Regions:
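Catalytic cysteine-centered active-site loop
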Residues: 47-50, 70-121
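Extracytoplasmic/secreted envelope proteins and their assembly/folding machinery
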Residues: 57-61, 65, 85-89, 119, ...
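Aromatic- and glycine-rich peptidoglycan recognition patches
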Residues: 21-39, 45-49, 98, 113-114, ...
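Structural motif
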Residues: 122-124, 144
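Bacterial Sec-dependent N-terminal signal peptides
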Residues: 1-24
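Eukaryote-specific, low-hydrophobicity, charge-rich regions
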Residues: 45-68
Length: 181
């Protein structure tokens, strides 16, 4: 009878130990998933089709992730509603600590125009949609993707290779050195 009790106790201790290890692993996995930085990284890795490298500007990606789905509002610059230049202005203020204008045409005057092939994370992209002047802008994220406030879907990520954006793309721009920092 003593051996049965000892075996039963050993089995119970083993079961409790295994259960505790399983719970600890599940808790660590849940913490990893709920970490906003991990969520942003996972989101952009999927959207952009590439793993974000350690050299990526994670502050940029986190900002965009936090604003995805913000509704469009002409002249807006808050999470209650934002237009394309208001979004870029907020992003540059919060991510790069740089103040830029709040109108896409005025902002274009603050950049050095660059070719599409030269675009880097954080550069600006400009569009002429149904006009001879700039009517829309966004922030380049890498891998031909850009973040912008769409009048129909709010803040979102789009691809410069999509037919619509390819048709209306005007130029890329990098903020003038005198305006940075």
């Amino acid at each position: 009878m003593g051996k049965k009790v000892i075996v039963a106790m050993l089995l119970m201790i083993s079961f409790v130990s295994i259960q505790a290890q399983t719970n600890n692993k599940e808790q660590k996995q849940a913490e990893k998933i709920e970490d906003p930085d991990n969520l942003a990284t996972e989101y952009f890795s999927q959207i952009m089709g590439v793993a974000l490298s350690a050299t990526s500007n994670l502050k940029l990606y986190q900002f965009v992730y936090d604003w995805i789905g913000t509704p469009y509002r002409l002249g807006g610059g808050t999470k209650r509603g934002v237009d394309c230049s208001g979004f870029a202005t907020e992003l540059y203020n919060k991510v790069f600590s740089t103040l830029i204008g709040n109108n896409s045409r005025n902002i274009f005057s603050m950049v050095n125009p660059i070719n599409k092939e030269e675009l880097k994370e954080g550069d600006l992209v400009f569009f002429k949609i149904g006009s001879r002047s700039i009517t829309h802008m966004g922030v380049y994220m890498g891998n031909n993707k850009f973040a912008h406030a769409s009048s129909s879907k709010g803040v979102m990520i789009s691809d410069l290779d999509e037919a619509y954006w390819r048709r209306y793309y005007y130029k890329g721009g990098r903020l003038l050195a005198s305006l940075r920092d």
